[in-house]
C-alpha cells in the first residue's frame, strides 16, 4: 500500500508541476487549454486503456499467483498489441478533425480554440503512452511488486519537469502545447516498465508488428480525415465528423488482426 500511495503522490506532483510550468509561460489561457486538452485525450484513453487494464487485472493476478508466467506474458502482449494498434490511428484521426469540434463544443473565441486544439493534439501524441501505462502498472501490481511503478514515476516526474522546462525556455511562444508534449515522459516510463518486466520474466514482450500497423493506419486514416474535413463543402463540424468517421473506417482493415485479439483478452 505504501509504494502505491507514494506513486499516486508522484502523479499529483506532475499535475502541480504542469500548472506551475504553464504559469511560467505567461500565456493567457495556458492552464485552461491544458485542462481541456487532457480531458479530451482522456476520453479514448479511459474507454480503451483504463477499461482493458481494469478488466485484465484479475486474470493477471490469477496467472501470477499460479506462476503461469508464459500465460501472464501472452496476456500482456495481446493487450498491448490491441492498445497500440488502436490508439495510434485514433490519435491521428482525432488530431486531424478536432479543431471545429473544439470551437463548437466549448464556445471559446478563435484564439483560445486554436490553443486548445494544438494542446489537445500534443496530448494525443501521448495517448498510446497513457494507454499502455495502464497495463504496465497493473502488471507489476498483479506480481505484488508495487515498488517498480514507484521508481518509474520518479523517473517520469524528472523527465516531465526537464522536458517541460526546456521546452518553455526554448519555445516560450508556443506555450501550453509544449507542456502537453512533455507528457511523452509517460511513454518513456511505460517502455522502461515493460523492459524491466521482460527481464524479470526472462522473455521479451514483442509488439513491433502492432506498432508498424498502427503507424501505417495512422498515416492513412489521419490524411483521409484531414482531406475530407478540409475540402468537402458544408458545415465544418459535420465535415470534421464525416472525415473522422471515414478516416477511422479505412484504418480497420490494417489493424483488424489486432482488433480480433480483444476477444482473447
In which residue ranges do the predicted regions lie?
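Alpha-helical transmembrane segments
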Residues: 136-144, 193-210
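Interfacial transmembrane-helix starts/ends
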Residues: 35, 56, 64, 68-97, ...
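Membrane-interface junctions at transmembrane-helix termini in multi-pass inner-membrane proteins
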Residues: 125-155, 172
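Helix-loop junctions and terminal segments of transmembrane helices
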Residues: 49-67, 137
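Helix-terminus/linker motif at the lipid-water interface of multi-pass membrane proteins
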Residues: 9-43, 59-63, 99-111, 233
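Transmembrane alpha-helical segments of multi-pass transport proteins
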Residues: 209-262
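Interfacial segments at transmembrane-helix termini and the short loops linking adjacent helices
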Residues: 95-127
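Membrane-interface helix-loop junctions in multi-pass transport and translocation proteins
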Residues: 147, 157-194, 223, 227-245
Amino acid at each position: 500500500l505504501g509504494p502505491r500511495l507514494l506513486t499516486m503522490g508522484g502523479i499529483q506532483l506532475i499535475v502541480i508541476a504542469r500548472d506551475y510550468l504553464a504559469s511560467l509561460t505567461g500565456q493567457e489561457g495556458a492552464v485552461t487549454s491544458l485542462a481541456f486538452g487532457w480531458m479530451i485525450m482522456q476520453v479514448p484513453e479511459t474507454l480503451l486503456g483504463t477499461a482493458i487494464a481494469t478488466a485484465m487485472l484479475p486474470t493477471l493476478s490469477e496467472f501470477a499467483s499460479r506462476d503461469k508466467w508464459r500465460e501472464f506474458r501472452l496476456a500482456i502482449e495481446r493487450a498491448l498489441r490491441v492498445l497500440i494498434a488502436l490508439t495510434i490511428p485514433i490519435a491521428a484521426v482525432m488530431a486531424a478533425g478536432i479543431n471545429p469540434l473544439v470551437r463548437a463544443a466549448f464556445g471559446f473565441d478563435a484564439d483560445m480554440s486554436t490553443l486548445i486544439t494544438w494542446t489537445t493534439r500534443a496530448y494525443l501524441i501521448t495517448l498510446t503512452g497513457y494507454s499502455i501505462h495502464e497495463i504496465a502498472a497493473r502488471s507489476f501490481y498483479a506480481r505484488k511488486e508495487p515498488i517498480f511503478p514507484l521508481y518509474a514515476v520518479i523517473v517520469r516526474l524528472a523527465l516531465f519537469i526537464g522536458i517541460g522546462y526546456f521546452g518553455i525556455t526554448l519555445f516560450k511562444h508556443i506555450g501550453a502545447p509544449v507542456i502537453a508534449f512533455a507528457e511523452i515522459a509517460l511513454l518513456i516510463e511505460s517502455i522502461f516498465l515493460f523492459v524491466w518486466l521482460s527481464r524479470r520474466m526472462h522473455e521479451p514482450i514483442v509488439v513491433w508488428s502492432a506498432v508498424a500497423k498502427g503507424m501505417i493506419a495512422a498515416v492513412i486514416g489521419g490524411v483521409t480525415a484531414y482531406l475530407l474535413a478540409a475540402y468537402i463543402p458544408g458545415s465544418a463540424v459535420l465535415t470534421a465528423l464525416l472525415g473522422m468517421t471515414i478516416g477511422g473506417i479505412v484504418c480497420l482493415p490494417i489493424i483488424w488482426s489486432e482488433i480480433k485479439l480483444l476477444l482473447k483478452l
